[in-house]
């Protein structure tokens, strides 16, 4: 199956609905052939529908003439069969066109979601610092579905409506110029209304998609942090923000749907007005002998065929506006700046020893606000290194730079003498196991969660890791043991979740380990269990520990004390206490009341 075209550079983001529609056309290029076939079928179905009233007029005239001279049943039956054949054929080719278009649009949705998924893996971490999860989810689900359904309902409809409108107009004038002018004159109002409604609804569709993304982002944040919201008594504040976003979504959705919903009843009114006008003028012309009765019957059908395209065109344009608004958000996401290409990075370490060097590292999240000013440190293989400091000192930032989640402003980070900037990011990531403060588990079995990211792991390896962290007995008491499903309803404590992620890191068996405040979310009793598990995990590996509780890093081989992006002290626990500097201040503040 074909993938859609890749996203463009950040300087080429769609600026408006028009450009996003052009981008959609480019994205549809792999399916031009089936789309053309679908449109041809639609054209055939439309043309058959257009000629049917003419055959109906012949049938009416034959019956009308036969009332005086005798009805020719063979001719009547033949006319009926022809009309049935026309309508059946028109429906068959129209169904075929719909089938093809639905298939294409589902492939388009699949391709877009695939492109978004691939894009997520290429985005730098700084993108996720500024965008909510809910907004990204909204683009993957709501916006892509809007594009797919809107294009599916509008492309063939628009073509059919235009062809039907032009074809019926030609046939009406060829049949009776005066009745044609009557039908068109009564429909001019429809054109005016359509132009007004489409011009007014465009901006509201754009606002609706944006507000929907804001809503998803807020709900996701409040759901994931509902305990914090309650604990801080911020329920009213959260509700106030929800009400604000909900009001914005309500207003934009109401306005867009109101203008869109006006089309059908207004077009229905125009159609009924056309029926009345045609009947009055047609009756006058029939009585004067200018036209036959069958022509009036045909024109009543033509009025419907003439006015329907107006409402269909309006609805199709409205759907295209909705697709364009959703396309702006999707293509804006796909056009986000990606991480620099590292395919040219050929450096590789066959056997990782674990020596790490930071050389005059300088970095910041904002161009004019450096966080790490001039960081240098040497870590020997197998050392247990703790990084401590006040909140905002740059501890986690250093680990993110080590993992090459961000690119340095200047300086170098080396692993076994090789700069990480010369290695592929995936190779750098494979060198580290991570246990973070915020545990991440997914819907799946315990076994699948523990073996995550490590193909070919045996059941014995999974169970051995769980025995080392003290989880094996608990898991085996579950109804299905290691095959028990883990989900939001699973009653795992914070400590058990942390032990599970430590077991995952053990199974991964990476040569270096990063422990980012892994005990900060557990109670003191559980901390002992988690600490023992982490000690087993770090044994024989170079390990980096970002510590909040300094009691957990007293046995570290090297403690780096950071303040405002620089190392201000380094040494062992005893050495740093003896210096009486920042480390002693941090340590004393935690234990002075104990």
Label for each model-derived stretch:
Residues 125-126, 142-151, 155, 200-221, ...:
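An intracellular "coupling" helix at the cytosolic face of ABC transporter transmembrane type-1 domains
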Residues 3-12, 106, 114-138, 142-144, ...:
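Short intracellular "coupling" helices and adjacent cytoplasmic loop segments at the cytosolic face
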